[in-house]
Structures are given as structure tokens and as C-alpha cells.
Amino acid sequence: EDDSDVIRQCLRAAVDGPFFSDSEFHTLFGFERTTLRRIAESWPVWDDPVEQSDAVSNSFNNLLGYPHGRWDVWHDYITPISSEVARVFARWRGETGLNPSGEGYFNRLR
């Protein structure tokens, strides 16, 4: 998979997967699930690049760093293993790696 496909998979997983409850979705993502679904369905095209960037960043960050406890179904939604997804996220952010600590998670929230 190329990076764009991994991003698409992560957006779809965040929206359609069992990783995030409706009650905490807006708090975690800064979007309603319906908005993130529209961004995911239109990937990579979206009329607001800042909104799209926030959606991608928060999808990656929450899938990798939030304690969703659903690693058992990760591969039902996302093909690469989490360490490869983290490398894609780092490249997308223009970084060489990600700080895996809780502080790193909170620093990456948008």
C-alpha cells in the first residue's frame, strides 16, 4: 500500500470501526462522525485542507495512541501493522518518528 491508501484505511477505520464510541467521538476528533465519514469518502479530495489535515492527524493519532482496546480487529480495517501505520503518520507529519508516550499523543492532537 502507498501512504495515501493507508491514510484512507485509517480514516475509514476511525469512522466505521469499533474503536471509538459515539459519546466520545467529537471530543477525540473535533468532528462529528458524519463529517469525518464525508472526509473519508472523498479522500484525498476535500474543499478545506485544514479540516482534512486535522481529520487525518486525529485519525492516525487516536488509532495509534488512544486506549481503544480493539487491537483484535485492527486488521479487519487496516492492512499494515501499527508500527508501519506509525511510520506513515510520521512521514505525513514530516517527522522521522513519533514520540509514543502519552505526552506525544496529546501534543499531536489537533
Tell where the protein language model's regions lie, with residue ranges:
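Positively charged, low-complexity terminal tracts
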Residues: 1-110
